[in-house]
């Protein structure tokens, strides 16, 4: 029995440590799946030895103590957790337990919701006015986050409608959409601030700021999923009915809430959500399944830490632990040196992962990563797997320092890192084989010169056989030379030559984009082409003149200026023009002479349009004298927001920029 007691003590100590890291420090060290495994192991041992259960065991309570920096709010109704199931068999067993426990043969219907990966909060309204908000904390006492919650635009400060209870405590999840998470980390990397490992940590860190002004700058949102206190009023007698009532009063509720009539329908809902998960725009880690009838919920009751009438059906873990066996360095199209962790292969979210990006030297330093470390790997949707954190408590003794190269691993040229930039780059330019391949692939891509039939494998062979060194060499290729490549017959070779000939007729914007100037995407290339009109004017532009172009700041202006100042680049451009690459003469548009509501305005498009393509919309706006930019800044005059508009819309609202929808855009275009 002594060994069992020791196991229980060790498990409880380990779980308490990780609960503290997760709930209090917002710095989890292990994946949720590993925590769940430890909790299951503890619960199984306690079930076999109930005499050894202690009141302070992690199985007997919900979370961890609140931060001392916040005042505390005691929950009038405890905020309990949910039990988890991880496969269909376990869910069906839960379904059977529910059916068996009910005293009548009344049919059970299930209300199914998304299990959001954010921070659980309670919000108290008195006579319809928001008076307080708290985190879950330990389930009994939470942190007072009222000032911060008031900054979240999705949460109404006052409910609207009729028959609002005198006191109503709603519960839900504060979370951060993916677009907002990426923007926060992008800004943090640029300013040297804290980079968050995942949206959940970012949401928690944003909500638990002591300064509400910081929270207000974060694009947090909220979905309501339940009720705590209810006094001086009534609510519907079904869970779904209550959610719909909350929605009528102005509280946000997920539109994916679904009523299922059977266990089979619940499983179908689970698999549909799992399929849609990568496109939701925010993180979820499963679905929550609740008995819909409040009367049946009351019959079923609660266990120590969770209701018997609800369960969380979790998806396969998106995080797993493994070991870093080595770190290698890859060279990209623009010469960026990217460290890649070579991992002990591990299944993450159903995919075998053996590599993970480490981004740059700063990220390696932030993680404190060494070769041989045990790490947490995260893979969400189609995102490239990344190292979330190092499990320092389990660091082996024989780890080695990661040494960033001083010379390019491909061509041996010096590696430089510009002050203020996180990325180190090879200085080899066109002599670097890695850059040559990638820059040529970019040059012929669909949105650049659009050379039909010239895929990556052809470019690889052309470079390896040294048939092509610069983009201009592509237009010197003959069908005879191309037939020497693998799987390239005379007909295919002639088709590629014809495609190259066709690609010579392009646009100034496409040509600029195809050159692969650092940080010049399609929108910036279009802006440069529209502003300067000719290649000669652009080549002669100073850094100050370049910054007059919408969406071009000092960094991009410097990259463009330096690119055209480099003689070898100008020589390649001259060769391309000599080979016949051309585009129409610019149509000079004087915004002052155009009678249009868009004339002279800097406009940004965001979201998807239903009545026309974005390219058509851009072209029409330019015709009417607008300058179409790719990102929102203080220079922006107008944002046109289509469906599923994301971070650009949020930034426009933050800056107080005028926003119109597609319908209004079409009306103005027609006027």
From Swiss-Prot:
Keywords tagged on the record: DNA damage, DNA repair, DNA replication, Ligase, Magnesium, Manganese, Metal-binding, NAD, Zinc
Pfam family, one: HHH_2
Annotated residues for binding of Zn(2+): 408, 411, 426, 432
Binding site for NAD(+): 32-36, 81-82, 113, 136, 173, 290, 314
A Gene Ontology BP annotation from the UniProt entry: DNA repair
Active-site residues per Swiss-Prot or TrEMBL entry: 115
Domain BRCT, chain residue ranges per copy: 593-671
Cofactor(s) the protein requires to work: Mg(2+); Mn(2+)
CDD domains: BRCT_DNA_ligase_like, LIGANc
Catalysed transformations (reactions): NAD(+) + (deoxyribonucleotide)n-3'-hydroxyl + 5'-phospho-(deoxyribonucleotide)m = (deoxyribonucleotide)n+m + AMP + beta-nicotinamide D-nucleotide
EC id: 6.5.1.2
One Gene Ontology CC term in the entry: cytosol
InterPro entries linked to this entry: BRCT_dom (IPR001357), BRCT_dom_sf (IPR036420), DisA/LigA_HHH (IPR041663), DNA_ligase (IPR001679), DNA_ligase_AS (IPR018239), DNA_ligase_CS (IPR033136), DNAligase_adenylation (IPR013839), DNAligase_N (IPR013840)
Any one Gene Ontology molecular-function term assigned to this protein's record: DNA ligase (NAD+) activity
NCBIfam families xrefs: dnlj, PRK07956.1
Stated family: Belongs to the NAD-dependent DNA ligase family. LigA subfamily.
Function field: DNA ligase that catalyzes the formation of phosphodiester linkages between 5'-phosphoryl and 3'-hydroxyl groups in double-stranded DNA using NAD as a coenzyme and as the energy source for the reaction. It is essential for DNA replication and repair of damaged DNA.
The protein, known as: DNA ligase
Provenance organism: Escherichia coli O1:K1 / APEC
